[in-house]
Amino acid sequence: MAIANANYEFIMIDVGTNDRVSDGGVLKNTKFWNMFENNQLQIPEPQELPNFNKKMPFVFVGDEAFQLLPNFMKPYNKQVLNDNRRIFNYRLSRARRIIENVFGILASRFKILQKPIKLSPTKAKIVVMACCHLHNLLMKQKNYIRNGE
């Protein structure tokens, strides 16, 4: 489970849950969820968007597996879509692509993540966390160029 910002950097990583658990189930077993439930995340106060006179809250964007909660957005059920909801789902999906793209960049940088890691769960967790931290470091290096580019 991970959360990324608009700069394609991880801001929260939780590694080690069995892949058979749903995203919603994984979330409830994270330190992030515990902090969220106990109001310890220090989510900024709502702010005005550019050219928009109304204050909007900061939110986390999830998929259908997540619960709809304050500061959490998820798509409308596909069974009850009208045009406005379809547009909303499309735009929410564009926001969700950030984390999907971050995982794509991560996997393309670190080939070890493209197949099952043949290490103990403890060591595999360390490898994944190290890859995520190195990814963030590389994202901050604006002049980083991969070999062959």
How would you name each of these model-derived features?
Residues 1-149:
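Short, well-ordered secondary-structure "scaffold" segments embedded in the functional core
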